[in-house]
């Protein structure tokens, strides 16, 4: 398979053909016995049918400035060990999804230099969630924190499905400016009887027009942001959730470049993939 990828070079059509083969091999195959056993034991310790998020975490040792945000799959509100194991395989397969392969090809990254870990986290049924940057992504002011927030699970904000509230604060948690987004929908847990993991529902007009976060929540988020940034010693991009007044840090990654904010980077990637012609092949969005 490595030979096939190497032979494909930067030819997108050949790369996608090879990637499709690998995805099929992953999905049709079995996880290594020791991996499956470890997952089963840990999941059992969490509790029977506990809800978890199965998240992809891609990296490349030789590409410290690379951003792979949003290129691989994450699954929310997954219940039951069989479904968890299936989602783990889907995460591994998503390293070779057309979106990810096209992104790496466009950026000039070696397809064989990337790796992927899968993280299984107990779900937080967030009432509010979003992302924050411990540096202003527009002005690069390191004394400011940018928070984007909306209702429900964080997928709404991360995927760009909603126009979230935008808060600009100092490192002490003092609000400097706020722009209220429309927040027309939110993503919540799916009904027990349904087959989907999550569902999208409307947000009331009143809640759309209100600020999502209050002063106390903003201060708490900023305090956690500073703590995470101090721990890693560099500006961070953080996904968070709030439930019953408590802040939960769901993901933290270094801001690999301050040339543009990640939302702009992801927009450019999406635009590239949309406009790419792959010799008649219909692109599959894994």
Regions found by a protein language model. Give the residues of each.
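N-terminal beta-alpha lobe that positions the nucleotide/phosphoryl donor
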Residues: 1-119, 208-233, 249-251, 255, ...
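Conserved divalent-metal-coordinating catalytic cores
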Residues: 13-17, 90, 130-286
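General beta-strand structural signal in soluble alpha/beta enzymes
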Residues: 53-56, 77, 119-120, 133, ...
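A general secondary-structure junction signal
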Residues: 56-58, 122, 242-244
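Structured beta-strand/loop patches that form or line metal/cofactor-binding pockets in enzymes
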Residues: 110, 115-138
